[in-house]
Amino acid sequence: MSVRPEKAPRRRRLYIDTSAYLCILLAEEGWEPLSKETEGAELLSSVMLILEAKRNLVRLARQGALTPEQYKTCIDHVEQDANVFVLRDLTLDLCRSHVLPAVTTPRSLDLVHLRSAHWFHDVERIDRFVTKDEAQREAAKELGLPVTRAVI
């Protein structure tokens, strides 16, 4: 009798855009199911996630929506999370890509996320493109990316 080692189950691969990331980081409405969905998953994104998250945290702090302590805590989390995510660099190849949604015309930074997710998906299937932005969800769907069933 031979015993074959069981193949380890494949980790879910989730592409997280900035809207979903900030929702979790700032504990906005709907953050709990998003956070639960990311548990144990391989988290993918663009390096733009870090830039956009930090910029939004500065904006919120300047508007008084975050205390200095909250700002510092959030910035520290972004720095730690940068080491948890697999991040796609913004390269000339990504900029030259012809990948565009069929109908939707996304903003430039949204397009960076879409092209990055598409690149990851081409390398190895992603299980879900996670976003809080309805237009971004629709654009991802147009590109054939698996999307959340509904914006959470």
Would you name each region that the model predicts?
Residues C23-L25, N56, A139-A140:
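Residues that scaffold the ATP/ADP-binding catalytic core of kinase and kinase-like folds
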Residues M48-A102, F120:
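Active-site-proximal, substrate-binding regions of enzyme catalytic domains
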Residues V84-A135, L145:
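Active-site neighborhoods of divalent-metal-dependent phosphate/nucleic-acid chemistry enzymes
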Residues M1-I50, L60-K72:
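Short, well-structured N-terminal submotif of metal-dependent ribonuclease cores
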Residues M1-R13, S46, W119-I152:
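Acidic, PIN/NYN-like endoribonuclease modules and their adjacent C-terminal/linker elements
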Residues E37-G40, D81, V123:
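Alpha-helix C-cap/termination motif
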Residues E29, L51-E52, A135-E138:
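Short alpha-helical
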